[in-house]
Amino acid sequence: MASEPLALDIEKEPSGPLFLAIADAITRDIMRGRLKPGARLPGTRALARALGVHRNTVDAAYQELMTQGWLHAEPARGTFVAEDLPESMAEPVSVSVPREPATVRPHLAFSDGAPDPRLVPDKALARAFRRALLSPAFRGGADYGDARGTPVLRHALSSYLASDRGVVADPARLLITRGSQMALFLAARAAVKPGQAIAVEEPGYPLAWEAFRAAGASVRGIPVDAGGLSVAALEAAIESDPRIAAVYVTPHHQYPTTVTMGAARRLKLLDTVERHGITLIEDDYDHEYRFEGRPVLPLAARAPAGLPLIYVGSLSKLLSPGIRLGYAMAPEPLLTRMAAARAAIDRQGDAPLEAALADLIRDGDLGRHARKARRIYRARRDVLASALSAHLGGRIFFDRPAGGLALWLHCENVSADAWAERAGVAGLALLPGTHFALDRAAPQALRLGYAALDEGQIARAVDILARSLPD
Amino acid sequence: MASEPLALDIEKEPSGPLFLAIADAITRDIMRGRLKPGARLPGTRALARALGVHRNTVDAAYQELMTQGWLHAEPARGTFVAEDLPESMAEPVSVSVPREPATVRPHLAFSDGAPDPRLVPDKALARAFRRALLSPAFRGGADYGDARGTPVLRHALSSYLASDRGVVADPARLLITRGSQMALFLAARAAVKPGQAIAVEEPGYPLAWEAFRAAGASVRGIPVDAGGLSVAALEAAIESDPRIAAVYVTPHHQYPTTVTMGAARRLKLLDTVERHGITLIEDDYDHEYRFEGRPVLPLAARAPAGLPLIYVGSLSKLLSPGIRLGYAMAPEPLLTRMAAARAAIDRQGDAPLEAALADLIRDGDLGRHARKARRIYRARRDVLASALSAHLGGRIFFDRPAGGLALWLHCENVSADAWAERAGVAGLALLPGTHFALDRAAPQALRLGYAALDEGQIARAVDILARSLPD
């Protein structure tokens, strides 16, 4: 049972905390295969002596790796490399040592448009969560049981939507969910009978299609052009296919192309939906991230009263993908059906998280965070756009997105798949158009979700992008 | 816009904090209708002056009531009684002022078996949550995306189940869910095709039936006797109804009757399930709460390898209904199907909560809490059993439950519904047998979930119970 000696290759002058450099060295050894799943690590005392560091430093490194799932401890037996390594093993972006040693290839990823969790107002959130847990309301179990979510958050969200987006949302018509994914699933359950279809944008958001299919609906792609969903094509589809009972749109920043649906087309869409009596599902997933021009209000802010419109939003894009909080606004009886289905699959909301986020909204922390994040992401967008023009101008084209956390890169004369493959080998993960295709041919394009990369990472990523452009 | 003067009837010598006494007085005025929804409250300064207390005290009372959803603040306008009063309005158990003024009737409730959220190790939980939010793993977004849940919690849970229950659960076969409700929904989605049926205990757990129906399955009741689910009746049902594809059981403490399934019947159940090739869904919802005799290991601890058994558990019963964390263990490919459905309806788990609970398990806080809670609940059970015998002996009978958070009270010669109605008028909420009935006649019985009531509250509740016994 004696463990192997562990000769770690730790950076001599790590740019971050020493414990992270140790954690990073161990992670590298696991990735290289020098430390196998199940292998036992030396005790913290022994390793500290071997490395000439304080035992607490080694302990912090082990704790960090346990939190990340690389190691696990067995009481009275020791610390072992996890048998079941985290999914992120292939993408160790989480090891936050900014300078990589020469032996390890830089590993970067353009996401599908995730925010930067490093910006999360974590101290304010931790404080708010603590307040929520220690509050008499939580200890008294007061919020047990409303499938629509904690009243206090529905009230706070109602004010937020009214002041920020012109959406008048009666708290009684709001449903808090676990991220917008659940809101989309519940919307489809409430709006569509099994066997019916939902018209969706193509290219579009595959996770929404999964939610709709899980709810028993089929999905039918409607083409997207430079103005967003083609309402003429939608109209034709509805007339030819009586199964279409709803349409799903991302008018603010179309996913994945980032285009904004213009005012005239918005009115035409509302009119089409109303005439055909179908449900409109509006996903306003990153409303806060508008950098240019006047804010575009959601369809929900100007839809005629009585239109069956389900408005879906998320706080995950605003904070971190790890904060699971979405919401939906819908008229009765759609909301009642959604709440009933939510109770059946999830009983009730998450009282402490909901109370904590209500606090952040009420105290203004969320608004402050949104302003700060908007400033940072806007700068990152500009860095990305400049670097792309400088390195790839002429070979590719793109519109600098007016908002959102991603840029849509057209590359008509290049295979986006081949490009993504070559970039992957060079250490940069990319999402080509095939990722967003339903039935039609995939666009030769890449979605570059840049927000989680800092400016140095963006520069390196564009460098790899340029070097791996297929001939 | 001037607000009405507010003449509050505050207890002169409140037994709790003064701010809670003020909050309580305001709540009473709302409930009495003296303060209407939408009414404006005086400013904190004015009210503090009127009451002769410090302004912070009034502020704390308002904050408390906003957290509970009774009031809401509008920036620059003032504080108002919520238009949309919390569901708990009819049951202000959350207002934790122990001594009620004579004008207000004591309001108590026997639950369906919820734990006491006042016992939650909230400080340890707040600390663990803070650590999780501030950890590099969370800020790095490392845990994004595994639909089975955070690896570190699956590892911690695996050790916990092995040491505590003899259940050998490979972390790769564990799925973390939002409470056991979602685990039950996903179990039915994975095990049963739409149109097929799940055999369930009757009387039984209506929320499980809702989850199964939401997954497209019908439910078929199998009678329960003093030894739990009748396996002979199950066998007959399977033979007569080929739609039955799964059976749902609560063998440890049958819900709602609290009886434990004996060893011989357990073996017979496993044998029946195996011979007919149906899936076994075992809900071990309150394993930790065994007061008497040797611990009874779950079916999952002794099921033959390869049996399609889905084992479902929850940390909500151990901590608080407000902490939404359940889990399921299942063999491949059931687990893969469950994880895929979970991704479609909820994308991913709750990284901070999962990391925080992994911490509580690893540090031993969860085990310490379980031991403490077990001691307290056992004492409460004894107080309840003694009070029932003293006040109602001869009219009713019950077995002192060996475990669990509820007691099943038989009252064959009394209408349980009439009893519940009379007790309700006197201020005690009760759950009669009708609440747990599917197709068969409801048992004349009451489920007394006592765990959330302290000993004084139990005494008062039994007093009301005795006084409202129908003739």
Per-region residue spans from a language model:
Chain A
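N-terminal basic, amphipathic alpha-helical segments
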Residues: 1-133, 137, 142, 146, ...
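Active-site PLP attachment segment
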Residues: 76, 302-337
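Short glycine-rich anion-binding loops that position phosphate/pyrophosphate groups of nucleotides
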Residues: 115, 251-255, 317
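Conserved core of the PLP fold type I
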Residues: 139-277, 288-306, 310, 377
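Helix-loop "lid/cap" segments that line or gate small-molecule binding pockets
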Residues: 157, 327, 355-363
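A generic "structured core" feature
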Residues: 207-210, 276, 280, 290, ...
